[in-house]
Regions:
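C-terminal active-site subregion of NodB/CE4 polysaccharide deacetylases
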Residues: 75-170
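Metal-dependent polysaccharide deacetylase catalytic core of the NodB/CE4 family, i.e.
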Residues: 1-70, 134, 139-147
Length: 170
């Protein structure tokens, strides 16, 4: 049914410097400086190239939808292979919220609308609303959804796979 592999952060750490304080809201560290963030993204890209040599990846999905202004600027300036950022359409604390557009720096802003393999009525409503508004369907699945009981692992792979197939047919 198609699909695309993208980058989802180095060690699931958002691209944020020490000027961001997550407090008790998110369990993340910040990067010491921009050079450390840049090194992490380079390593992430090399890992992707080594792991999937025949796949061209161009989408960056911020961990927990968090992407600081400094991190966003660094991606645009230093990583031309990243041509799309897929974060969040809906607001949330620390979220990098997007509209569907091409930014002034040329990066495509393409928010994700739904995610996971537990497709409930809210997800269907959100997906249908987006289809009506922009004629777009965007869905994201975390690789570790298969291991996280809160995100469907308790259902088992066959049920999760069936849910995704049913969603695509829907």
């Amino acid at each position: 049914q198609g699909g695309e592999l993208g980058y989802h952060g180095y060690n699931h750490q958002p691209l944020s410097l020490s000027n961001v304080d997550y407090g008790d809201v998110l369990p993340y560290d910040t990067w010491k400086n921009e050079a450390a963030m840049k090194k992490a993204v380079k390593e992430l890209i090399h890992f992707g190239e080594d792991t999937f040599p025949s796949v061209s990846m161009s989408v960056y999905v911020p961990p927990s939808n968090v992407l600081s202004a400094e991190g966003r600027e660094m991606l645009a300036k230093d990583f031309p292979e990243i041509r799309t950022i897929a974060s969040n359409y809906f607001t949330g604390e620390f979220a990098y919220v997007q509209e569907f557009e091409v930014a002034k720096d040329g990066i495509v802003e393409q928010p994700r609308i739904i995610s996971g393999a537990i497709i409930d009525d809210y997800m269907k409503m959100a997906a249908l609303s987006e289809l009506n508004m922009h004629f777009v369907n965007s869905h994201f699945i975390h690789p570790d959804d298969l291991l996280d009981e809160d995100r469907g692992a308790a259902l088992g792979w066959e049920k999760m796979k069936g849910n995704l197939a049913d969603y695509m047919d829907w």
